[in-house]
């Protein structure tokens, strides 16, 4: 028995009346022959026509959308519309019995089950079911790069824990041949949040970027205001631009124009091949703040920052890296002390109410100069103060300055002041100063070592470094054991201590600045490290921060952007092992060409951890931004892994492109 459903006439008339489009045909055949039973044939034809009613099938060898062959012998009088505006599905079902099919002249007895074109004279369609289907699609479009040959890739792993949130916003870089890759693994703990925001800066003038935490504008008289929660919009690159946002924290990139304002301080050495390393501590309720300003303005600069997230609960780690050219700045700040409410800028012990301030002046202007400052741990008493200043190196070549400040005595209200005169201006000179220990009485004053009593002050000043090449300045200060002591190098084991280390930029080439401080093991400590930017070429900034083992620790590292070309910024943050840890990484854009920004954040092992990474776009050409954030391994379920790689080549800057979104990697949960 043969069943023919014929509706083509009615639908054809309605299609012609409504001026619908039929332009090309997509045809598929399904032949099913049950045994025993009738043969069932299902033919589905999708037709799209263009608006020209006089067009012939030969005028359109294939559909404009699908590229398939048209149906032969379609009436040339059918109206045609623009491809993809309308699609018509024509279905034909024929159920055949055991008797033979009536023979029609020019029509084969079987329907070929193939996609090959059919001879126009071989098929005669007697019945069709026509269904009009109009589909409107809104694809997920990633961010479009504003430059030429730019690439923006984003892969986001879905959080494996309960109530986890993973947000990623990435704007495309505005330079040519720039690549921005971000891979973020969602935390595996419960109530964990992983937020990664990468914003490009608009390249036009009078542009406005409103969202949250914009980078600082690169034009003159620009303003960047914001309070950031998760999103860091790109800042305009033109003049008189405004970027306003609302968020919890604001870490704008450094402004490149005049009268601009930024939240980044200190300069890295201005010489070539300078090195500055910073390693941050960890403790319970500790705070570690490391600021590594913009790298030198030369080419081929490298900035590396490795920050271990605190292992306690409610820990926070922030890292912002700069960019410059082939200079090296190395600052090492060990873990924080074991006391409560301690603050250290380099490394501070477990004492209470202690203050440590360490200042290392600019490096020499010659080549191959070395400045080494070592500050031992401060005393175990409370309210101690130790101040050590190491001036610039001498102007000769191959000079060495070594200053050693022993531990202060155990008396109370003692003061230790050590001054090392400037080094000679000749070559191969060496200055070594060692001050003996201060007496153990109260209210004592010593030129080198301070007693262990309370309310003692130790001040050590090293001479100015020579301007020649190959000079070395070394300062070592032992911690006092009394209370109320303040040290500029190492802070005691009491609580509520502060350690601050500031290193000025060296103006020579091949200079090295090294600051090492022992880590405090107490809680509520703060470590702050500020390094001035080097203006020379081939500078490297490396910051390594060890994770605090206490709870509620905070690690903050801020590095301003280098203005030179071919700069490299690398940030690595180890996972905090405690619960409720927070890791925040902010990287300002390098303004030079061929710059590389790499940020790697290890997962916090506790629950309720937060990982936030903000990377501004490199404003030069051939810049690469790579951000990899591992998931926290605390409470929750699932695992996320992400890897990002970016490479760019070329020169110049591209125009601004439209904003884009992102889509998750195949297989990832949204």
Curated annotation (Swiss-Prot):
Top-level taxon in the UniProt lineage: Viruses
Keyword Iron: no
Compositional bias of kind Basic residues: 638-654
Keywords: Repeat
Biased composition regions of type Low complexity, renumbered to the chain: 205-225, 363-395, 471-482, 490-503, 525-634
Biased composition (Polar residues): 342-362
Membrane spanning residue stretches: none
Protein's UniProt name: Uncharacterized protein ORF50
Chain residue ranges for the region called Disordered: 53-83, 187-225, 339-395, 471-503, 525-670
Sequence repeat start-end pairs: 143-158, 171-186, 200-214, 215-233, 234-252, 253-268, 279-293, 294-309, 320-334, 335-349, 362-376, 377-391, 392-406, 407-421, 422-436, 437-452, 464-477, 478-493, 504-517, 518-531, 532-545, 546-559, 560-573, 574-587, 588-601, 602-615, 616-629
